[in-house]
């Protein structure tokens, strides 16, 4: 299981968590929502953590046009005072820096993208990529872009959240994702699945609201298996192999 960082302030905690639990794979990156929280030495700090922990990946990084179109909702989601969201130019600059670090080290990268799939595809086509591939987490892009991303080495993960009836359109996109590029995720603590996908209810002590967590992963896999018309066991074997290929020890083809 991968634990993604969102910014400099949580990278030590990510590393410590992975140190306590050997089954966890740490990831370090600056999420586009938190770019304004970087220090002057953020690039050196990122390189430090990636080089200190060779099993680590880069993430979560990406592009987000949604927050530029919905700044008040973005601020509300952050739960604290914030200025204007980072511009697309600022996001693209930070993304390319981190993406190149992943490519130079051949580390997988977990990508966040909201309403910016065209610019993201253009950047990926124009820059060197990790040979082992990368993950488009909670893929919310159009079906017609799946082949283009897949040709560049993309894997596509589906969260339990996509089992909500209102996400039917996006769920359908995963019917055309190549079988050897599909992964399952929770995106915990965000993207709470439907009640049927919650195995162990948790409450966020800060808000009193239900909290998503990794133990909901099996239910997400079972729901996706039913949707795709395969057994849960078959999908578990398939996605486990995909996970090992992307995040496990690398073997050149």
Q: What does each model-found stretch correspond to?
A:
Residues 1-253:
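Mid-domain alpha/beta scaffold segments of enzyme catalytic cores
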């Amino acid at each position: 299981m991968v634990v993604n960082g969102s910014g400099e302030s949580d990278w030590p905690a990510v590393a410590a968590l992975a140190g306590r639990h050997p089954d966890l794979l740490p990831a370090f990156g600056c999420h586009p929502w938190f770019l304004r929280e970087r220090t002057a030495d953020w690039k050196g700090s990122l390189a430090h953590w990636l080089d200190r922990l060779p099993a680590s990946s880069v993430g979560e990084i990406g592009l987000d046009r949604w927050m530029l179109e919905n700044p008040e909702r973005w601020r509300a989601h952050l739960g604290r005072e914030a200025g204007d969201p980072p511009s697309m130019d600022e996001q693209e600059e930070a993304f390319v820096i981190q993406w190149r670090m992943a490519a130079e080290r051949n580390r997988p990268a977990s990508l966040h993208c909201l309403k910016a799939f065209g610019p993201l595809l253009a950047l990926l086509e124009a820059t060197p990529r990790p040979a082992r591939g990368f993950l488009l987490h909670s893929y919310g892009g159009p079906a017609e872009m799946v082949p283009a991303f897949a040709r560049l080495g993309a894997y596509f993960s589906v969260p339990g959240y996509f089992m909500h009836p209102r996400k039917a359109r996006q769920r359908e996109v995963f019917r055309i994702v190549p079988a050897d590029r599909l992964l399952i995720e929770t995106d915990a603590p965000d993207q709470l699945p439907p009640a049927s996908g919650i195995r162990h209810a948790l409450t966020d002590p800060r808000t009193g609201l239900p909290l998503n967590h990794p133990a909901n992963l099996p239910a997400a896999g079972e729901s996706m298996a039913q949707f795709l018309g395969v057994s849960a066991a078959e999908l578990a074997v398939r996605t486990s192999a995909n996970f090992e290929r992307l995040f496990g020890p690398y073997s050149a083809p």
